[in-house]
Amino acid sequence: MSSSCQICVFPSLAELGFSLSQLLVNESQCSDGLRLGLSGGSLVQLLCRELPKTAALNTEGWRVAFCDERLVPFSDPESTYGEYKRNLVPLGLISESQFVTIDPTLPVEKAAEDYTKKLKELFSGNDLPKFDLLILGIGPDGHTASLFPGHPLLEVTDKIVAPISDSPKPPPERVTLTLPVINAAKTVVFVATGESKATILK
């Protein structure tokens, strides 16, 4: 399978947001039911600001999962799903049933197992989920999803979703897609904004 890498630099957040929204428009047109994985953090505000004003965006048939998720109640501002839900569902842009979520009431190991089961149901017939598009952030330390530099989870190859209970960045308990799942996606976009990310990108 051939692969290519493209680096795009945008002079403003507005232009970055517009580019991401157009990517989602294009992916929606090319996919029969877009299978999308999203990250949280600053990406939530960026996408939730841009998507409602994207006229050509058709979210019908979308299924939206998360590249990682913090083990907190959905009402907590730290919940990635909670933030997307609060910003997008009331606008009618997407329905709650289109999201694939963790169960934050479970212990972190069980939450990872439960999320694995849900992803296997979404990608029936595939041992390894193959997302159409993953949109990931990058932290100042270089972490993406909840995969942190030097952490043992980087070596995990036998799981779809892994639990983490010692995240260097709070909250400590999270679940995350593993590197094999990220690498298997059709398209992966890494979004980095602000001066704090410049050093790690260089």
Positions of predicted regions on the chain:
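N-terminal glycine-/serine-/threonine-rich phosphate-binding loop
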Residues: 1-36, 109
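Ligand-binding beta-strand-loop-alpha-helix segment within the catalytic cores
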Residues: 1-4, 59-135
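Glycine-rich N-terminal segment of FAD-binding domains in flavoprotein oxidoreductases
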Residues: 30-55
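Glycine-rich beta-strand-to-loop/alpha-helix junction loops that act as flexible
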Residues: 38-43, 136-140, 193
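A glycine- and small-aliphatic-rich helix-loop capping segment at beta-alpha/alpha-beta transitions
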Residues: 50-59, 82, 86, 149-158
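A short secondary-structure junction signal
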Residues: 112-113, 145-150, 200-202
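Class I SAM-dependent methyltransferase SAM-binding "motif I" and its flanking Rossmann-like core
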Residues: 134-180
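ATP/nucleoside-binding phosphotransfer catalytic cores, i.e., glycine-rich phosphate-binding loops
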Residues: 180, 184-202
